[in-house]
Amino acid sequence: NNWGIGDFSDLAQLVTKAGKQGAGFIGLNPIHALYPSNPEACSPYGPSSRRWLNFLYIDVTALPEYTSAAVQAVVNAEDFQTRLQTARSVEYVDYSLVTELKMAALNSLFDEYYNAYLKKNTKQNREFKAFIQAGGESLEMQATYDAMQEYLQNEGKDAWGWPVFPENWRDFHNEAVAKFAKKHKKRVQFYMFLQWQAAEQLEKANQAAIAA
């Protein structure tokens, strides 16, 4: 049922089944954050961050708001379903295609979640803010980096990594970076949200492993 790449729900099922067979642990390749706007840079040994997660491992179908009409309209579109079947059927992971599919759904899902919870004083908003506070500057840096790389990519500019960013964007503490983050606040929040949901799903897999 995954979207062409193993996800955290797959992991939860695996550890449960493995535990029943007497396994004591499951080994994983690194699952660090990579480069969502440069999906072919997919080596787990060359991450953009060793603290944050690769949110392509999120099980989109397990997220809140997935069943909303807006998200369902995206994922049930004929073209989307055709590409999804392609992603599932190829011999090796097509990282670019998987990224396109997941980002299309996640963008729609975040809009729904943002309007339902993050614009108001809700339990979900408080939990999200607590995650952001716990992540501190490191999370802000990661989310801002992802948003900046995406922005440059959309502008048709070279964006494979920070060495080719505009010079005043290469240091997180530069005023230009702060201005970008403020101007694109919702987009930065989007990438923070993905880290939050990835962490939540990984913890569920961890709890499944403990229970197994």
Regions picked out by a protein language model, each given a short descriptive name:
Residues 1-212:
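Acidic/aromatic-lined carbohydrate-recognition and catalytic surfaces
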